[in-house]
Each structure stands twice: as C-alpha cells, then as structure tokens.
A protein has these predicted regions:
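Short, flexible catalytic-loop segment of classical short-chain dehydrogenase/reductase
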Residues: 23, 62-73
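Alpha-helical segment proximal to the catalytic Tyr-Lys
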Residues: 6, 49-53, 111
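Residue(s) in the substrate-gating loop at a strand-loop-helix junction
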Residues: 19
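Active-site helix of classical SDR
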Residues: 1, 36, 44
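Hydrophobic alpha-helix immediately C-terminal to the catalytic Tyr-X-X-X-Lys motif of short-chain
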Residues: 39, 43-47, 51, 61, ...
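A conserved structural motif in NAD(P)-dependent oxidoreductases
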Residues: 87-98
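Active-site loop-to-helix junction immediately N-terminal to the catalytic Tyr of the SDR YXXXK motif
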Residues: 25-34, 46
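Short C-terminal tail/terminal secondary-structure segment
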Residues: 103, 114-127
Length: 127
C-alpha cells in the first residue's frame, strides 16, 4: 500500500477482503488461509491509522459463506446446507450483497468509517 499511497487522492477508500475464517480459524485444513486473513484484518487497522491522516480510509470485508463458483466447486452441498442453517437468516449470502457493501465503503456515504472489519455472514458470527 505504501507504494501507491502517494498516487491516491484525499478521500480515497481502500477495501480489503478478509474472511470470517480470520476469527474462527476456518474449516479443517484451512489454517494457512485463516492465518493470512487474520493478517489482513490487522493490516487493515494498521493502514487505517497510517493513511487516515492523509484522508485515505481503509476497511475490510469479512464474509462468511457466500454462494460463489468457489463453493459450487469445492464445498459439499451438505456442508453448505448446515452452515446456511446455522445463520439467523437461514441462507447463504449472495455476491451482490457483498458488492453492495463494497459500493457503500467506496462512496462518500462512509466518509467517517475507517479501520473497520465488516462481518457479512448473515449473523453466523458477531463482532
């Protein structure tokens, strides 16, 4: 980020992608993935502190189970059903719902929001 920070105008917004796995460790065999996403959440907070005085906001999304091609290809249907059933909203998230949050964070409507890691998981886990 430091390499392109001088090119970013005041009021710019950086949106990182983390994961619910950053907090709960992910599923079996995903220790490295979960650890890397944990680093993203901490990096987001650190960069928010560094870049905030320059007028640049930094936030991250921490999605849970979002219906994507990745899950179509690599997550068993029965696992998806179980996880979706554990959310208070009783379903998987959709990519367009994640995109809506990205649009909000990129807009001036979120001009006082920085250093936040947003859970977008249907209530499966709360911050």
């Amino acid at each position: 980020m430091q390499a392109f920070e001088p090119l970013m105008p005041k009021g710019a917004s950086i949106i990182n992608l983390s994961s619910l796995a950053a907090r709960d460790g992910g599923g079996g065999g995903s220790a490295l993935y979960a650890s890397s996403k944990g680093a993203v959440t901490t990096f987001t907070r650190a960069m928010a502190k560094e870049l905030g005085p320059k007028g640049i906001r930094v936030n991250a999304l921490c999605p849970g189970l979002i219906g994507t091609k990745f899950h179509d290809d690599f997550t068993k249907d029965e696992v998806r059903t179980i996880v979706a059933g554990k959310t208070p909203v009783r379903r998987e998230g959709r990519a367009d719902e994640v995109a809506d949050l990205v649009l909000y964070l990129a807009s001036d409507k979120s001009s006082f929001v920085t250093g936040a890691n947003f859970d977008i998981n249907g209530g499966l886990a709360f911050s």
